[in-house]
Amino acid sequence: YYVHVVEFGVYECKAKGVFRKEKIKPLVGDNVEIEILDESEKKGNIVKILPRQNELIRPAVANIDQALVVFAITKPNPHFNLLDRFLVMMESKEIPVVLCFNKEDIATNPQVKELEAIYESCGYPLVFVSAKEERGIETIRELLKGKTTAIAGPSGVGKSSIINILQPEAD
């Protein structure tokens, strides 16, 4: 596990055996206490996982402020049942959701209007983007600013493309 310690950097840490015995696994986003084993090599052990504000199983994360749920408008067409399951899961954990629909550059106006009619009326913030043309990315950047955000969605919808535009060093 890589643990970011404010003002000291990133430490490569192992979880103590006590976590395995208690069937607790550290998650991305966990706030933890570590013991430093080797300062020069930035090695340590996770000794305590602090209480979680929230946690998700898929993606396996904890302590998030919001979720950016990404689906394509087309190619692949949105699977509404899957999208609704994402929304129900986030609602059950009281995690605010921003819905991001990618591939606006190849979508038709009726496709966009259908998504607006369904999900805007439910009160979800919607962002329509084209990762290919880097359109709408600044809106996402503003919505993410200062928040710990989980990004979720099915394969092939452009999650990695959006992340790579937002943070090229993440590639």
Residue ranges and their predicted role:
Residues 105-157:
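Canonical P-loop GTPase G-domain recognition
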Residues 79-82, 111-112:
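Residues at alpha-helix caps and immediate loop-helix transition turns in enzyme cores, especially N-
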Residues 1-80:
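N-terminal accessory targeting/assembly segments
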Residues 29, 90, 144:
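Residue-level signature of catalytic and energy-coupling elements of molecular machines
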Residues 64-71, 93-102, 123-129:
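Conserved beta-strand/loop subsegment of P-loop NTPase cores
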Residues 159-171:
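A conserved segment at the C-terminal end of the G1
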Residues 81-91:
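Histidine-anchored nucleotide/phosphate-binding helix
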